[in-house]
Each structure stands twice: as structure tokens, then as C-alpha cells.
Amino acid sequence: HAKFVLKQVARKTDLIAATRLCPGTDLYLKTENLQVTGSFKVRGAYYKISQLSAEERAKGVIACSAGNHAQGVALAATRMGIKSVVCMPDGAPIMKVESTKRLGAEVELVKGTYDDAHDRAVELQEQTGMTFIHPYDDELVIAGQGTIGLEILDQLPDVDAVIVPIGGGGLISGVAFAIKSLRPEVKIYGVQAAGAPSMEHAFHDHKYETLDSAVTFADGIAVKTPGETTFDMVSQYVDEIVTVSEDEIAAAILALMENQKLVAEGAGATPVAAALFGKLPLAGKKTVCLISGGNIDVNILSRVITRGLVMSGRKTNLMIALEDKPGQLSLVSDIVS
């Protein structure tokens, strides 16, 4: 049903071969960075809001997001003539904040992290009676995200493995459920930023837990607390979860730009980072990396490119203390050359 409903708004994004990206691996990219609003999030948000009653629609919807879910909710609500309010952490990329406003939502910036924005959204929901559209821990949202899994099976029927970014777990829950229901032998791998490994910890420790902090430039997956529903689904349907460092994410973003001419945000590049740096057993497997979004702030992108160049050995930063006397710059150039 979600697949039918989403035909009205979501694109069936391309699945492209990435032969140059990771030599020796049969790699494909599911380009949700080219989705409406630049992210997969519109799928879950639109499907959830489309199922609201007339009474719920009249009261409006409220959400919390670091950016991509915000844009999905704003677009869906505006398309259906419904009022939307979105609480966003004050550190959210300006591009995502402004885009959310342009799409018709009222934005409230909340000091702190995503979790602080979530608490504020719940508070407002209790005060106003608006329907809270959870970014990941909701069965209808998960069903919307799961349509990506159906598309992957349609586009690459003999797929062996799919690598998916994880923040709160909504995307991988939907994709894993959809694929495993039809092709249980397909491996589903999750990837988190090493600085925000909430689901990775929960998965390997077999218990639901909250991190003290979630620090990563991949703002789309900087989540301290995974969803309860998503944790249960991940535990049941996901084969393994790994983490990647900030440098590895930066290198993956750069590799996608140079080799595939694709712009991915930090979260969206994590599956490619896992493939590039040998985090998973992919030899001999037709593997799909799900590029979840491409909404990266240009200032962050500039720093990421520099970081990626350093990571790949093509740029070096030097700090040299010199005496204040003639001939020092000549000495430095002689040493460097």
C-alpha cells in the first residue's frame, strides 16, 4: 500500500553501477540523494501523514529533525493542506532549516542535539494536540522507508547484500523487513558513525540503551537513542552493524564526488565508507550501498573535501615555527622540496 501511495510524490530513484568506486567489489548505488527533498525521508513522512484521519489533519502535525525528516514532513503536510511545525536542533545545517521553511513548515530551533529537539516537540504536541510524526520509531514511517527495499529488488533481483546507514533505525528497519520478507538470504548490513554508535551498541550488547553523546558531522545519523520498534526489527532482520570514522566518511564523500559525480551528505556516504575501508565481507557479492541523502551544507562540504584529500594522501597541512630572521622561507622551501 505504501508503494502505491508514494507513487504520487516519491521518485523511483536510480540504481547505478559503481565499478570504479571500489575495485574488486560488484558495487551499486541506490541514489536516494536524488530523491524529492534530497533524501529518502519524504517516503516515510508522506505515507504516515497520508494515513491521518480528518480530525488529525485539522489539528496539524509536529515533528523533530536535524533536517531531512523536517523537509519530508513539510512537503507532505503542505501537499495535503495540513499545518506543520518542526523542532530542529540549533546546530542543524542552515540549508536544511531554510529549505524546511520554504516547503511550508513553521520551524522552532532548539538549543542542543536532536534529542533536545525531540523533547521540545513532544512537549508542544501535548500542549496543542497536533499529531507527532516520529522520524523513525513509527510503523507507518518504517513502511514508507521500506519501499526502497522493494525498488532495490525490482532493479537488481539477484542482489546479495545491501548496506544501509543507521541513525534511529527507521530506514534500515523498513528496507530489511521488505527485502528479508521476499529474499531472506540477502544480507542486510547497517553502518553508523563511530561517534554516534547507539544502534551498533544496542545490537551487539542485545539491549536497548542511550548514549551520553552523539558527535559526528553526519548530522542525519547523530542520534543518542535508537527507536524501540526499530531496535526490535534490527535485532530480527539485520545481519551486522559496523561503524566508520569521520575521516572514512569524508573520504567516501570525496570518492563519490570524484568517481560517480554524486554529492552525498555524511550519513548517506557511510555505506560507501564501509565498503571502501573493508568493514564488511563483500567479496563476490552484488552489493547495494544506499545513499540516503545529499543535503550537505556547502561550508561543511568544503571542510570534508579538505579532510578527504588529507585522508587520501593528496594534501598535507604543515605548521612550522620559524625564527624571525631573513632566509627562513627559503629554508622551508628547500626542506619541503
Question: Where on the chain are the PLM-derived regions?
Answer:
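PLP-dependent amino-acid enzyme catalytic core
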Residues: 1-337
